[in-house]
Amino acid sequence: MLAKRIIPCLDVRDGQVVKGVQFRNHEIIGDIVPLAKRYAEEGADELVFYDITASSDGRVVDKSWVTRVAEVIDIPFCVAGGIKTLEDAAQILSFGADKISVNSPALADPTLITRLADRFGVQCIVVGIDTWFDEETGKYHVNQYTGDESRTRVTQWETLDWVREVQQRGAGEIVLNMMNQDGVRNGYDLVQLKKVREACRVPLIASGGAGTMEHFLDAFREANVDGALAASVFHKQIINIGELKAFLAQQGVEIRVC
């Protein structure tokens, strides 16, 4: 059995790490490189960086900090933000990223997933899915351009349909960003995760809602996700990564303990 992964997420805007609640009202957390180094030293299995306004601004991720991150950490990291071409992806990978993630650009042009997978291999192509539960309809829908709340829009895709679509097109991993739970710290949406897990044959990463160590445990035990991503509990030092991994190991979760 592959070890489960603990993945801090760093949302980047204007060269700094920020964090919002339900993808809104972002506050500045700190500088990118020191935070990345801290998480690597605490025992994170990998890091994910989202340049959250790149797609809505019509630009690609600022590549200058990618090189600096690669110089100070020795764990894998994934970069996302406005990657629309093979050239964009190649440059980010050449600067030291291990994976690239696409989200809004893939919704605009789903063939991008296949072209990236064919060129670089499925192992380094991640698809991020920003999913919102509509209480009126009882359905989960995929949202686009979520880094800028003034430009966010609901797409035609229901979440499970898009999960199936991106796998067919070559996604090597899926990060499910559950917007209703984002930053609230009341736990992951286990109901949604279980549904997506049934439809997902590639590694699945849960994102949105972690507030306690037990929330991570629930995601691994009940939804059988491959990794759990979180931001605010790590940024605000509510949970220490090393202590979290020790707790999970004590509970019988297969996890890499430093």
Swiss-Prot record:
Catalytic activity: 5-[(5-phospho-1-deoxy-D-ribulos-1-ylimino)methylamino]-1-(5-phospho-beta-D-ribosyl)imidazole-4-carboxamide + L-glutamine = D-erythro-1-(imidazol-4-yl)glycerol 3-phosphate + 5-amino-1-(5-phospho-beta-D-ribosyl)imidazole-4-carboxamide + L-glutamate + H(+)
Record-listed E.C. numbers: 4.3.2.10
PANTHER family, sorted: IMIDAZOLE GLYCEROL PHOSPHATE SYNTHASE HISHF, IMIDAZOLE GLYCEROL PHOSPHATE SYNTHASE SUBUNIT HISF/H IGP SYNTHASE SUBUNIT HISF/H
Subcellular localization(s) per the UniProt record: Cytoplasm
Family: Belongs to the HisA/HisF family.
Function as written in the Swiss-Prot or TrEMBL entry: IGPS catalyzes the conversion of PRFAR and glutamine to IGP, AICAR and glutamate. The HisF subunit catalyzes the cyclization activity that produces IGP and AICAR from PRFAR using the ammonia provided by the HisH subunit.
Keywords, sorted A to Z: Amino-acid biosynthesis, Cytoplasm, Histidine biosynthesis, Lyase
Span of the signal peptide: none
A GO BP entry: L-histidine biosynthetic process
Organism phylogeny: Bacteria, Pseudomonadati, Pseudomonadota, Gammaproteobacteria, Enterobacterales
Full protein name: Imidazole glycerol phosphate synthase subunit HisF
The keyword ATP-binding belongs to this UniProt entry's keyword annotation: no
SUPFAM superfamilies: Ribulose-phoshate binding barrel (SSF51366)
Known partners and oligomeric status: Heterodimer of HisH and HisF.
Active-site residues, as the UniProt record annotates them: D11, D130
A GO CC term assigned to this protein in UniProt: cytoplasm
Pathway given in the UniProt record: Amino-acid biosynthesis; L-histidine biosynthesis; L-histidine from 5-phospho-alpha-D-ribose 1-diphosphate: step 5/9
GO MF terms held by the record: imidazoleglycerol-phosphate synthase activity; lyase activity
Broad class of where this protein is predominantly found: cytoplasm
